[in-house]
């Protein structure tokens, strides 16, 4: 986990897109999109794991002891007592991590894959679209804002539904 958290996402994407194929056998091929999805997944999983670890550490020791006193085994204790409480506590942190993931998607343009900002950069070089770059950027900003606002409102609603304050 510390490795993935200690390396910038742009470096992880560059390594997955450019360096990783150099270490594969010549007849073995993994598409660049798949490599980037795996790299982003590993990167974001490290951050989500840290958020969940924080939630687990925030629970009082008494919760563990109470579950053990009821005769629950390790897995049963975690599935039915500990994780539901910890996940309820970390809703804001997980939502923040997913919002950061959405905001990090334009970085895949650096390794040659296109997303909304990458397509905009490609379109503004087209002679038919000269002079319309500002409108494209405004449109992209509105799309990102709508997605992030919707995710933020959903997170807020989850917090209210489950009363995540301590």
Predicted feature descriptions by range:
Residues 1-166:
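Transmembrane alpha-helices and adjacent helix-loop boundaries
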């Amino acid at each position: 986990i510390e490795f993935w958290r200690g390396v910038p996402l742009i470096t992880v994407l560059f390594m997955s897109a450019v360096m990783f194929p150099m270490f594969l056998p010549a007849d073995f091929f993994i598409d660049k999109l798949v490599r980037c999805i795996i790299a982003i997944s590993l990167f974001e999983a490290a951050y989500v794991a840290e958020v969940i670890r924080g939630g687990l550490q925030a629970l009082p020791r008494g919760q563990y002891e109470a579950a053990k006193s009821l005769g629950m085994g390790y897995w049963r204790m975690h599935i039915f007592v500990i994780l539901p409480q910890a996940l309820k506590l970390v809703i804001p942190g997980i939502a923040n991590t997913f919002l950061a993931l959405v905001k990090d998607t334009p970085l895949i343009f650096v390794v040659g894959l296109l997303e909304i900002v990458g397509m905009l950069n490609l379109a503004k070089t087209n002679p038919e679209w000269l002079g319309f770059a500002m409108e494209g950027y405004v449109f992209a900003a509105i799309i990102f804002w709508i997605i992030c606002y919707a995710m933020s409102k959903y997170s807020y609603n989850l917090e209210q539904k489950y009363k995540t304050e301590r």
